[in-house]
UniProtKB/Swiss-Prot annotation:
Family: Belongs to the SEDS family. FtsW subfamily.
Pfam family, one: FTSW_RODA_SPOVE
Species whose genome carries this gene: Helicobacter pylori (strain ATCC 700392 / 26695) (Campylobacter pylori)
Compartment annotation: Cell inner membrane
Summary of the function given for this chain in its UniProt record: Peptidoglycan polymerase that is essential for cell division.
Alphabetic keyword roster: Cell cycle, Cell division, Cell inner membrane, Cell membrane, Cell shape, Cell wall biogenesis/degradation, Glycosyltransferase, Membrane, Peptidoglycan synthesis, Transferase, Transmembrane, Transmembrane helix
Name of the featured protein: Probable peptidoglycan glycosyltransferase FtsW
Residues in the Periplasmic compartment per record: 28-38, 92-105, 166-168, 211-294, 349-358
Listed GO CC annotations: cell division site; plasma membrane
Stored InterPro entries: Cell_cycle_FtsW-rel_CS, FtsW/RodA
This enzyme's EC code(s): 2.4.99.28
Length: 388
């Protein structure tokens, strides 16, 4: 089987597993909390999965020389307009989370424009970096910084928009990480990368200390981390460093219990306890904890192996491509998927603060699923381009 066909089936398998878990982990929430039928979330995710796979297959058949840039610019410019438009929509046409409007209600389906903007932003970076950093000869740090200024302006504007209108620091961190690493892949120096990371860290600290709910999240994270970390230190040192009276992270606490209950082989599909009111949204951001409880450590390893295969296949396609903007886009898709997975997994494990990022393909959410299918579909079209 060819690389692109393997990629299609690998992504489809992850989508199937996500649909399966959307039923297994959401039945209690669906019936008890929302008073829907037990198949409510399952059917919605199944419909999104079918549409996503069809889109993925359809995009794999398009000619990227004609459609890649058109689709990329569409995803770059239309979602921001929708995000701004949501601010003026009545509550009947929009859904809120975290104090911000994030979804447009379209009857059976709710659309989250930010999920599609991430693909558009990745396209913009690939398209633009291929014209600047890739096309230029080796430059010193000062010249690189001058070249980087327009990107920083675009990112700051994006960060302000997402931060103010969407109140979503997690997505800003994700897009910033993609920008920084993609700069290195496009030929930027390690010194430039270090300066960008330093600046991003300073801005992140400022964003945290100016927001009460982010400070609380940081305290919840440190409360859980110090309990695990200080067990490795001598008692006297641990007691000296410990900060008492910190709130305990409800989500991470129950996620840890779920992973402990799952053990090596898991409780069995549908037999987990975490979904029974302990974590009502386990089928979304905490899906890895639900998988760990029902499928065990081995089941979780299977999921990570599938993601690893997916990433390797995309890298192989990127390596075959001669056009820099195409190969950079493929790398950007890898970064979006891998960073989302790692940030979510580290949040569930208590290593990082919980950021609310979905696990690609596995977490419940039609917009996230469709956006990832579009990204994979475009990669598949580029793989077909290498054959032509």
């Amino acid at each position: 089987m060819t690389t692109d066909r393997n990629l299609f089936f690998c992504a489809s398998l992850l989508i199937f597993l996500g649909v399966l878990m959307s039923y297994s982990l959401s039945t209690y929430t669906t019936v008890v909390l929302y008073h829907y039928g037990e198949f409510h979330f399952f059917i919605r995710q199944l419909v999104s999965a079918i549409i996503g796979i069809v889109i993925m297959w359809g995009l794999s058949r398009v000619d990227p020389s004609k459609w890649f840039s058109r689709l990329g610019f569409f995803l770059l410019f239309v979602p921001p307009l929708l995000i701004i438009g949501m601010f003026f929509l009545p509550e009947s046409l929009s859904s809120s989370a975290g104090g911000a409007k994030r979804w447009i209600r379209l009857g059976f389906f709710s659309l989250a424009p930010l999920e599609f903007l991430k693909i558009g932003f990745t396209f913009f970076l690939a398209w633009s970096l291929s014209r600047t950093f890739v096309a230029k000869e080796k430059a010193n740090v000062k010249e690189e910084l001058i070249t980087f200024v327009p990107y920083s302006v675009v990112f700051v504007a994006l960060a302000i928009g997402v931060g103010v209108l969407q109140n979503d620091l997690g997505q800003i961190v994700l897009l910033g990480a993609v920008l920084a690493v993609l700069l290195v892949f496009s030929g930027g120096s390690v010194h430039l990368f270090g300066l960008i990371i330093s600046g991003a860290f300073a801005i992140s600290v400022l964003a945290i200390v100016t927001s009460e709910h982010r400070i609380l999240r940081l305290k919840l994270w440190w409360s859980n981390l110090q309990n695990s970390l200080f067990t490795l230190l001598p008692d006297r040192l641990a007691n000296a460093l410990r900060i008492s009276d910190l709130p305990e992270s409800y989500q991470v606490f129950h996620a840890g219990n779920a992973m402990h209950n799952g053990g090596l082989f898991g409780q069995g599909l549908g037999l987990g306890q975490i979904k029974l009111g302990f974590l009502s949204e386990v089928h979304t951001d905490m899906v890895l904890a639900g998988i760990a409880e029902e499928w065990g450590f081995l089941g979780l390893c299977v999921c990570f192996i599938l993601f690893s295969v997916l990433i390797v296949l995309i890298f192989r396609i990127a390596n075959r491509l001669k056009e820099p903007k195409y190969s950079l886009f493929c790398v950007g898709v890898v970064l979006l998927i891998s960073f989302s997975l790692v940030i979510n997994a580290f949040g569930v494990g208590g290593i990082l603060p919980v950021k609310g990022l979905a696990v690609p393909f596995l977490s419940y959410g039609g917009s996230s699923l469709l956006a990832n299918c579009i990204a994979i579909g475009l990669v598949l079209x580029l793989a077909r381009y290498t054959k032509g």
